[in-house]
Every structure is written in C-alpha cells, then in structure tokens.
Amino acid sequence: MATDGASCEPDLSRAPEDAAGAAAEAAKKEFDVDTLSKSELRMLLSVMEGELEARDLVIEALRARRREVFIQERYGRFNLNDPFLALQRDYEAGAGDKEKKPVCTNPLSILEAVMAHCKKMQERMSAQLAAAESRQKKLEMEKLQLQALEQEHKKLAARLEEERGKNKQVVLMLVKECKQLSGKVIEEAQKLEDIMAKLEEEKKKTNELEEELSTEKRRSTEMEAQMEKQLSEFDTEREQLRAKLNREEAHTTDLKEEIDKMKKMIEQLKRGSDSKPSLSLPRKTKDRCLVSISVGTEGTVTRSVACQTDLVTESADHMKKLPLTMPVKPSTGSPLVSANAKGSVCTSATMARPGIDRQPSHGDLIGASVPAFPPPSANRIEENGPSTGSTPDPTSSTPPLPSNAAPPTTQTPGIAPQNSQAPPIHSLHSPCANASLHPGLNPRIQAARFRFQGNANDPDQNGNTTQSPPSRDVSPTSRDNLVAKQLARNTVTQALSRFTSPQAGAPSRPGAPPTGDVGTHPPVGRTSLKTHGVARVDRGNPPPIPPKKPGLSQTPSPPHPQLKVIIDSSRASNTAAKVDNKTVASPPSSLPQGNRVINEENLPKSSSPQLPPKPSIDLTVAPAGCAVSALATSQVGAWPAATPGLNQPACSDSSLVIPTTIAFCSSINPVSASSCRPGASDSLLVTASGWSPSLTPLLMSGGPAPLAGRPTLLQQAAAQGNVTLLSMLLNEEGLDINYSCEDGHSALYSAAKNGHTDCVRLLLSAEAQVNAADKNGFTPLCAAAAQGHFECVELLIAYDANINHAADGGQTPLYLACKNGNKECIKLLLEAGTNRSVKTTDGWTPVHAAVDTGNVDSLKLLMYHRILARGNSFNEEGSESSVFDLDGGEESPEGISKPVVPADLINHANREGWTAAHIAASKGFKNCLEILCRHGGLEPERRDKCNRTVHDVATDDCKHLLENLNALKIPLRISVGEIEPSNYGSDDLECENTICALNIRKQTSWDDFSKAVSQALINHFQAISSDGWWSLEDVTCNNTTDSNIGLSARSIRSITLGNVPWSVGQSFTQSPWDFMRKNKAEHITVLLSGPQEGCLSSVTYASMIPLQMMQNYLRLVEQYHNVIFHGPEGSLQDYIVHQLALCLKHRQMTAGFSCEIVRAEVDAGFSKEQLLDLFISSACLIPVKQSPSKKKIIIILENLEKSSLSELLRDFLAPLENRSTESPCTFQKGNGMSECYYFHENCFLMGTIAKACLQGSDLLVQQHFRWVQLRWDGEPMQGLLQRFLRRKVVNKFKGQAPSPCDPVCKIVDWALSVWRQLNSCLARLGTPEALLGPKYFLSCPVVPGHAQVTVKWMSKLWNGVIAPRVQEAILSRASVKRQPGFGQTTAKRHPSQGQQAVVKAALSILLNKAVLHGCPLPRAELDQHTADFRGGSFPLSIVSSYNSCNKKKGESGAWRKVNTSPRRKSGRFSLPTWNKPDLSTEGMKNKTISQLNCNRNASLSKQKSLENDLSLTLNLDQRLSLGSDDEADLVKELQSMCSSKSESDISKIADSRDDIRMFDSSGNNRVLSATINNLRMPVSQKEVSPLSSHQTTECSNSKSKTELGVSRVKSFLPVPRSKVTQCSQNTKRSSSSSNTRQIEINNNSKEENWNLHKNEHLEKPNK
C-alpha cells in the first residue's frame, strides 16, 4: 500500500499542476471576447459548459478518493513490527500543531486552489456573455427604430406638403378677411364716436334732471314739514272742539232732564184728565225705533234734543218702498244680474275690477251661449281664479248648488261679444250665508270685503230684504242713491269673494290639467299649448286668432306655390296623439297657431287644394320652412342652411303648427295604381322638382330601371340622404319600401342610422314599417339612438316607434343612447315614457351603460329627468335647467328634488354582481359615483360575486369620496352684538340665534357657499316675518330679497367662519369643505349692522320692529328734534329711544361732530327746576350772550307718565319750538337769578310715556312735540310678539321650523292669543290703564314637549303683573269719579265688598275668556293648573268654553266704549285693526236676550236664594247700582262679556240657541218673546256686522214704576230689528284714521255717549 501510495502521489500532484498551467497559459493569451461572432460565442459557451461538467466530475471523484488517499499517505508507511516508527508516530502526535510538519503535500489545498480559479473564470465568462447579449439586443432595437423613423419621416414629409398647400389657401382667406374686418373696424369706430357724442349729451341731460330732482326733494321736504305742523295744529283744534262738544252734550243732558220732567208732568196730567190706558209695549217699541232713526240721520245737536215722540214714518216708509232693482248701464265687465235672484248668483262675466282680476282671457275658447261650469273633476285652483276647463255637457257637469240658490243664469249671446274674459270658477257663486272667512287672506282684503258686505239692505238667506234709512248721509242726494250704492257694494263684494270664499273641491297643484277634457280633442304635443281648458293668453294681448283666416303662419311664405297632399284623417289624429310624448320649446308667438290647430284637428278633410296624385311631392321638408330646389337636396350629404330645430312648412293647413318640431309632415302620400297615369311620373316629377330636362336622363340612367334593382337603389338613396332620388323611387308603383338587404337593414334603418332626417320623414310618410328589425334585432330607432341622431329619434317616436323594443341582446334604444352618451336622444326617449329598468341578457341596465361610459349628463338625465303629464304645457328650458345645472353657481337640484329612479334600479347588479356604483368606482369615474351617492337608496356596502364592496374595487379618489360621503353640517347663527342692560327693556332680547345648518359638500365652491349663506339669511328673515309657520324649504320659491321686516343680505356687517373673518363673495385657496375641516369651524356667525355703524338692522332683528319703521322714527327725530314715544306699559319705548339715540350719536360722530347722550328718569318728585338744571348742564339751554358750540346733545326723558307734562314742560314749549336767539326765554335759577336762554339747534329731545293716551291739560303739550304712538293693536307692536316668538321657536329647534301642528307652535300661538285677547277685553271694559305691551310676553319659555312650563309661566305672569294691574284699574273705575288731570287714579285703600266682588268677577271672566280660552292642554290637565291663577276660583256659570284649540284670528268689532263723560276717552282703544268685523248677529242676540232676562231676574232674586253663579253676579249688580253708576256700567259690561260667545268664533256658529240661558219671568213678556223669535231668523252673512256698544247699552232698557221694586227706572223695551241693522250701518261707515298720530275716536262713540248719558240721567231723578 505504501509503494502504491508513493507511486501515485506524483501523478496526483501533477494533474493539478497541469490544470493550473493550462489556466495560466490561457490567461496569458487572453483573446478578445468582443471580437468574437455570435457563432463563436455559442461554441465558446458550449466548451465552457463541457469543462464545467468535467470539473464537477473530477471534484466528485477526488472527494471520493480523498479519505482513502489521505489515510494511505499518512499511515501507509507505518508497520506494527517497527517500534521505532511507532515512537516517532507518537512523538509527532504529541507535538504541537505549529511544530508539526506535513509528511507530504496536502492534495486538498491543491484542489481548492483549482476550484477557486475555475469559479473566477466562470464568473468572468458569464459577465462577458451577458454584456454581449445586451449589446446584441440594443443593436436590433436600434435597427427597428431606424426603420420606423424613416417611414414616419416619409409620412411627415407628405403631410407637410399638404399642410403647406392648405396653409396657403388659409392665408389667402385670412388676408381677405383682414381687409374686410379693417373696413368694418373703421365703420364701427365712426359709429362709436357718434354714440359717445350722444352719450355725453345724455349725461348732461341726466345731470340737469338730477339737479332738478334734488331741488324738488328739498321742496317736498319743506312742504312735508309744513304739513306736519298744520296737522299738529289741526289735532289741537280737534281736541279743543271735542272738549267743547262734550260741554254741549252735558248741556244737552240737562235739557233732556228737563224734557223728561216735562214729559212726566204731561203724563200725570193726561192720567188725571183721561182714563185711557198707557201705551202698549209694541207702541213703545215702535217709538224706540223711530228714535234710533232720528239719531242716526241727524246731526249732533239735533240728536241731543231728539225725543221719543218725533215721527218720521214717512221717510222710513219711503225708503222701504224704494225698488231694489234699478237699471244700470251694462258694461263688458259686469253685466246686469237680477237683484232679487236668490242665492247671490253671479253672471258668467267676471264681476271684478281690472286692478284685481289678473285672470287671463279665455273668452274665445268657450261658446257664447254655453254656461261655463267647471266639471266635477276639474278641481284646479289657481291664485286669483282657475282657468276655465273644457266645455262638457252642462247637464252632467253642473255642480250642486246650495239649497237656497237658483241655478246660474246663462250668458246671453248679446252680452257675449262684450266679454273678453271667461268666468272664473269660483266667481259663479257668491259665498253662502254661513261661509266663514278664508283663513289665509290679507287683512286688507278681509276688511274691504266686510266693508261692502255686511249691509242691512242685503238679501238674507230666504231672499228677503230689510231696509232702513242710512245712519248718516254725506250729501242730500244720498237717499236717492241708496240702491245704486248698494248695487256697487254688491259688485265689490262679489269681486272680493273671489279672494275670500272657500274653493269648491280639493285643491290640486296649479299645473295639473283639468280631467274633464279627456276625450274631447286629442292632446297636442307639448308646445306650450293647452287644450280648451288649459290654453292661456296674457291679459292685455288680443285674443287668439280664430281658425280659417289668412296670416296665421309664423314662418315666411315660400316664393312660389307648393304642391300639397291630402292627409289621411286617421293618420292625422293618430299622429297628433303621438306627438304628446315630447317636450318642445315653443316661443310665445305660437299661441294663436296652437288655438287654430286645436279647432281644426277633428276636421274630416284637409283644407289644402287637391292636385294630381302623381306629383304629390312636397319638398318643404327642409328645416328652413321654405321650398328647396331639387338640385340643392339631391346632393349627397348636402345640408341646407337651417335654423336649430325643425320648422313646419308655412302653408301647410293640414298639419300641426309646431314651430320647432315636426310632429308629422305628410309630404308624400302613396296613391293607388288606378289613379296614376303610366309614363307621367318622369315629366311631372321634373316639373315639380324644378329640374332641367337635360338632367333627367342622367338621373334615370337612360330610362326606367327594372324593379329588381330598385330596392337596392332605394337602400343607397336612403343611406346617402338623396332626397330627390328617394322621393322618385317612392312614387313608383310596386316598389317594396320595406325591403331588407342581407344584413336585414331596411331603407328606413339606413336613413335613421346615417341621420338623414328628410329621408326618414319621406319613408315614414310612405308608411314604411317603423319597427322593422335587422338580423340582430335592432330597429331604426335603435340605430338612430345609438348614433345620436335626435331629430330622427323624434320623428320615429312621433310615428309610434316602439321605444321599449329590445334587440337580441336585450339592448333598448335607451340603453344604446346611454352607452354612446347621446344626451338629446336620452331626453327624447325619457319624455316619450320609455322604461328605464329594462335589463340586457348580461343584466346591464341603462344606468350601467351610462356609468360605464362615464357620461355624467346621461346619468343625470336618467336619475332626475321627470316625465311630464300629457297635455300639460311645460317650459323645456326650465326643466332642462333644473337638471343640468348641478354643480354650477346655484345649489344643485338634487338638494331640492328627489331622483325619479327607484333604489332597486340603482342597486341592480349585473351577471358578475356589479352595480353601477361598482363600475363607476372601479373606473375612477368620481363624478358619476358622486351622483349615485346622492341617491338616498344607494347601498355602497353591497357585495359582488367575489364578495367585494364598492369601496374594495374603488380607485383612490373614489375611496376618498366614499369615505367622505356625509357633508359637513355647520350651524349658521345671527348675532346682534352687545345688547344694552335690562333697564332699557332688553333683558328678554337674545344676542345670538341659530337659523339653520348649512350642508357643505366637498365640491361646494365659494360662490355656492356665498349664495347659500345669503339665501339662508333671506329665507330666515322671510320665515320669521310671515303670517304662518314656514319652513326654510317653503320659502325657497319666494324670489323676493327683502323680508317684511326689511332685513336682507345688505344688513350684514361681517361674517366669521369659526374665528376667521369672511365676507360674501370672498374666496380662499382651499375649498369651503377643506377650509372648515382644517380650521375646525364649528359655527358660522353673521353679525348684523347696528347703531355703531349708523344702521338699525341689528335693532330690527333684536326687537322684531320693522326696519322701515325704525328708520322712520329716526327720520322724525332728525327732522323735528322733539319726539315723544308713548304707548301701553311694556311697549319697549325705552329700548327704542335708546337705540335711536345710539344710532344718531354714531351718525353724528361719523359726520365729524362730537355727540353726547344724557338720560334722565322722571318720577313723581321730578321738578321743573331739576329739568332746567339738566338742560343747562347738558348745554342744551345756552345763554343768549354765549355762542353755540358744535357739540350735539341727545336728551332722553324716561317715564314722563309719572309727572304732569303740562306742569313740567310748560315753560320750555315755546323755546323748544323756536330754537334761535331771536326767541329767547327767561328762566330763574335756584339761586334766584334770572337769565335769558335759548335751546341749541343741535339738541335732540326724546321722551317716553308708558300711557296709552293723553288726558286733560296734558293735551296742551301735544302740538309742540312730534308724537309716536305705539298702539298694541297696530304695527309695530301688533306683530312684534308673533315675530319674536316665532324666531325663538326657530332658535330652539336649531333653525328647523316645526310644523303648525307641533305642540310648541300651538302653545306659542296660545301665548300670543292671550296677549291679544287680554288687551281687547281690557279695552272693551274701558280700562286703558291696564293695557299691556308685548314686553312682558317676550320671556315666554319654549320647551319642546313640556307645555306645562309655559302654563306655569303664564300663571306667574298673571299673578304678578296682569291681575294686580287689572285690579287697580277696575277699582279706580268702580270707585269715585276719576280726576281728568292725572293718568291713573289710585283706587280706594279699603274697597267695599261690592267692589271686591266686581274685581273678582272681572278677574274670573278675563281669566276664562282671555287666558284659559284656547289653551292646547287637555281639559283635565288644564284644570290642575287653573288653581294657580289668581281669581280662577270665583264661580261664574256663563263663561266661554276654553277647550277649543282654534287659533284666534282677532277680536270682535263690537268693542265696549263705556266712556260717559269727556274725561274718559278710551274709545281709541276700542278698534283693533287686525280683524274687526268678526262678530255675527248671534253675538248681538245672545247679548240682548241675556241682558233682558238678567235684568228681569235681578228683580226677582231678592226673594230667592242664589241658584247659580249668574244670579250671584246679578245680585252684585243690584247691590252696586245703589252706589255708583260706573259700577253699574262695569257690571253690565261683565255680564255682556259672560253671555256672549268668544268673539273670534262667533261668526262660525250657525245657531247657538242652547247657549242662551232663559229665566222665568212674569207673563207680560210677549214682546220679549217676539223679539227673540225675530232675532233667531236666519241672517245672511252680509248682515253680519260689528256691533257698536250703544246697541248693547240700549238693550239695557228701563222698567216702568209699577214693575220695579227699586227706585231706579230701567226700560225693558227690546231693540227692533231695523234698529239693529241701522246701528250696524253706523259701525260699518266708521273708519279708523291711518295717520301716524293718535287714531281718532270712532264716530260711534258720540252716539254711544249719548245713549249712556240718556240712560244715566233718566235714573237720577228717581234716586
């Protein structure tokens, strides 16, 4: 083994050396690899791979033999028999590693060296090979690019040559145009110079006019000041005359007492001399009636001296005999109607004034002799009267009339031509007797209606007429003109009834057509023309032109006559019905044509001339509406110049006149073969078309072609749009126009596919099959819709093409139009009523198709375009604008209108489970996805077949959109800045109010945001100042920018977005959505302009006083310098004055003057000397020697009612009125020194008085000041509380106004009605001292869901404020006579028992009638709170039921005016202005009967115990009657208030007999029962009139001595019917003044005072 190992070692060591040597030699040579070819590189690569494989084999063999060789080499030479060698071996084994020496060379190291070298070579070779391959690829790519560039270079060179040629032509054309334009520029420059010269002249004229206008303004201001001064003088003179009148009346009263004494003496003498019985009760009644007539018709002095024995029977009988029906000159507006016709029937002519009647004229559409009654189903109600419907059979359409009304009269033919207006539906009948007031009317219309309606001479329900002489006549001839006046009143009443009477039938939307015209005429297409019941003509325009007259066409006439064809009547009618499916933008000039067409539709034959049948070709199919030569129309692709849209031929009498759309144009009508002459077609065609004979052979190719080739020629002509050839082919006999080629395309399909509208029209007129499908199932409509030829689509739809036809794949025309994004075609198909939910075989809907193409407009049309009702006129532009302006300046209609597609269609999934949202999100169509997300029914979490949602497949942008679907809702608040402290009456005014929440989307622009803020403010201002409960959505239709209180977007001072200031119209770099999120703006605050800016907008919003009135107050202060504000306590006088002072101060400071406000509170101890010191210290009073300063002083004197005005201001009146050094006044100071002073011109003096009116000596001050009266029943106080509480509710609901049925609205309305009813009752009781302003009710709590809180607050207000004031006023009235000099007199410190009972009765009545009445709480719950009210436990049996939830609209006109002497002038508080005539005869009947029975029962109550609470009150009346007349009058008034119904609800009560309490009396009450029966007769509403108080007081009649057990004389004479009606006329004639000063006392107060004086002084002698 050793020898073998030794022999093998050199061989093993030599092999690696040889390999290393070979590698070294190869390395030395190092041939260049880059120079090798591809084949050599491949060979080298194969050699290398072989060597690598051999190397691997060698390595494996060497590894296998390594161990064996190693062992043999190390241990092979040792033998066990040699110990020396063993020792040597052990020695080597025991030595260290460093000391060991290898016995032989290690082959492993040699092998590793070889392997390392081979690896290096392998890596180098692979790198070189990769570099070679990359270079080879680059080379090939560069070769290909070079070839492509060479080809492109050749193409570009060719194009360059072409473009050079074109550019040369363009340059030549531009040069010509430049020359032309330069000439035009010179002409325009000359024109401009002329215009500028004219403009300069106009400017000069304008400046002159402005100067004249300013001078006129100054003159008017001066004249106004003079007029105001004269008015103040007149007021003073009037007050003096009134005082004189009162003195005269007192003297008259004394004279009447003497007359009464003389009467009694005469009666005693008669009884002593004659034994005849006294006058019977009926005789007294008659005398009583005559007295009333004398009082009403004669003057003041005559009335004072009149007695009961004056006889004026002749005049009364004469008036009764006057005929009621008088001939009146007939007019076109109001023909005569029989005055004695029952039921108040109006003629068919509109009896209204031109200023009121805004109804369009329809007289030419309705026959003159046919009564125009609305059909029962025609329930259209418009604002001022509905349009007249069609004219069906009158016997079947006459509405049911009232039982007491005769059938309406028919308009005679003689009157018909005079009437240019059709009768409105609800002007045919006057309101019946029990018709109540329309709840939503203007108060002016209501007042005017009752002004002319409630007459005593009007016929009642039974047709009877009662007459009495007028109460007061202005002229001597008024008696003769009575009936004429009555007729005029009836006319105005009937005109007003159009606005006030309730409508018959349920109201429908104004745009709905009447349903009674179905079947009469086929509806015309939507060309802004309605049928007989819908056509409208504006007032003032001539009526529509009647049919069969020349000059009807709106299009120009052709230059030569055209050939016409007879239209088949059946096709005409069918086509007319088909036209209804589209909307057309029709100009107003098409109205007369539309009327003509409607009247001619049902004619059996056309009126066009009949020509030979063969050349029956009408080439007027060109859109221009005139004849086009055959040469112009025969060229392929030649489109003549046309206006947008399709126009009707000018002379076509047999077709619809639709200016912008051809509904049907029968220009070709195939004729039978028997009526054609062979061989005549060519020549006649040439003659008709205008060709020259030389062109005919070219077209006909030498003669007629065989029919076998004609269908192919027909296809070519239709596909190429050759109208002339197509018309020739269609006129040949035996030609199959429905022939289809190999692919199934017919001629109509080819024409529709290529958009040749004229060819389509020709083929359809030739009765080509409109629904013929090709081999794939596509019809011509499908082809036209897919290609976007909307005119062809319109024609095909008009010819009854199947709009829902589905091809073999399920594609409908709508699907194809959406797939190709053809907006106009989609719109036409939708208006035709196509089905949007048809699915294809793949489950795709049109919504999928629209979204797949990313067409936003198509998707919007599908989702939001509504299908209009047939026959209803609609403005196409309006509907289109409501669809497409989605992301424009205005808010998108998606925010205000709902999509028309259901949620199922939006969420429908196709075969893969993808919805439209999946497709939009996956393709990144963000706009389409956003539109889909606006649909409320979208399900974004719906998953497809792969369990993926829309968010899973969405792109990044769409994911962001889906993550931010919800828009930001930022509350918008209005701030009025700092409000002054509560001592100015502003403690209940709120600083900030939330009006709404703005929805800010990510796509919202700053312009949209500005418009949204402005619109929200305008809507809020309009909502809080409206008459009813509005929501912000209800106000959007209102286009007015100013509200009733005068606030608008111009009232804004600044706006802050969170804490960042912003102004309307300002834009930031970020969008509003990003801006709000980045700045974390939680609210938007709008600050209104206030006194600091010299404006009053914030004051208006804080106090709800209209801005115009505040500005008027400020103008009065600036103009007159001396202004006093007076009104009931709590009318915000102090707040108004202080805000006006602040505004005036800042205005003066802006003008450069220094200004100071000096405020002084006046109390009972405030003396004239203190006021003098105040004027001097504030530099208002300046010594004559001292020069005036430029400083402005504003002095405010508060609570002037606590002092005597005449004593406090007497010495200052003259110098205040004449402020100059020329009229000084000497004043004595406290130190005894006197000095001359005068008032500074720059001094403003304002005062406040918490008193409703001036009395006594205070009237002397009136003419020296400008007075502003804040009446509780007039603006601004009347609507202030309503607006304030409504704003409070809106703020509580965070800008969302609740519905009127909400409990919060009801409780707020109740609080408002409490204030109004309370003041009306207090005014009726004659206690103006107790009247309350709205300030106390501003703190009304608004707590949703807790109405009890408001009731508890009301109880605290009643106990703390209202009841003490009422008690003080009642005691001051029921105690001693009040002194005329000083406001309120103090009541007795220790009132008597009777006075206490009167106070309790008054509080109980006020509580039940004014406070608890109308409370929305349930009866059981309200009874629990009644005990909290002071005075609620006083027993009264006759009180108004307070469980009614009806809102009180106003109070009665029958106010109690109880002033019996000149010292009490409370009559001015007795006329509330919102709804005076709201009391019916029932109220009079209840009052009269109750008082008659009450007084009779009072005389019997001494022997009986108190049976009920009423008798208790009557005993109080009897007990108090022995003490004071005021107490007696007060108790009578309380009885009247108890016995009457609620004033607001009396007019709605038909008969309240059960509410009348009848008491047993003696047997001599026959006249009483007769009167009761007389009063219970049915009375029409025209007789319902406000009662003056003297009717009530006259009803408290006196008894005779034999019937009374007491010493006072009272009469039991009832008031006759004629007396009542006469009194109602007196009341109706009276009117309140509109002067801004104090409203004059009603004229009835004089007569009323006379009655009370008479009744009072009749009783004095018997005391």
Swiss-Prot record:
Residues 119-276 form a coiled coil. The keyword Repeat applies. Residues 1645-1663 have a biased composition (Basic and acidic residues). It holds the Pfam family AAA_lid_NAV1. The modification Phosphoserine is found at residue 1524. It is found in: Cytoplasm, Cell cortex; Cell projection, Dendritic spine. One of its GO terms (molecular function) is protein phosphatase 2A binding. GO terms for cellular component: actin cytoskeleton; cell cortex; dendritic spine; FAR/SIN/STRIPAK complex. ANK repeats lie at residues 709-739, 743-772, 776-805, 809-838, 842-871, 912-942. The modification Asymmetric dimethylarginine is found at residue 498. Residues 384-396, 1624-1638 have a biased composition (Low complexity). Its main location: cytoplasm. Residues 411-422, 583-593, 1582-1599 have a biased composition (Polar residues). The keyword S-adenosyl-L-methionine does not apply. Residues 1-23, 203-222, 352-440, 454-478, 498-616, 876-897, 1446-1485, 1580-1602, 1615-1663 are annotated as: Disordered. Interacts with CTTN/cortactin SH3 domain. Interacts with STRN, STRN4/zinedin and MOB4/phocein; this interactions mediate the association with the STRIPAK core complex and may regulate dendritic spine distribution of the STRIPAK complex in hippocampal neurons. Activation of glutamate receptors weakens the interaction with STRN and STRN4. Regulates the dendritic spine distribution of CTTN/cortactin in hippocampal neurons, and thus controls dendritic spinogenesis and dendritic spine maintenance. Associates with the striatin-interacting phosphatase and kinase (STRIPAK) core complex to regulate dendritic spine distribution of the STRIPAK complex in hippocampal neurons. This is Cortactin-binding protein 2. The lineage of its organism: Eukaryota, Metazoa, Chordata, Craniata, Vertebrata.
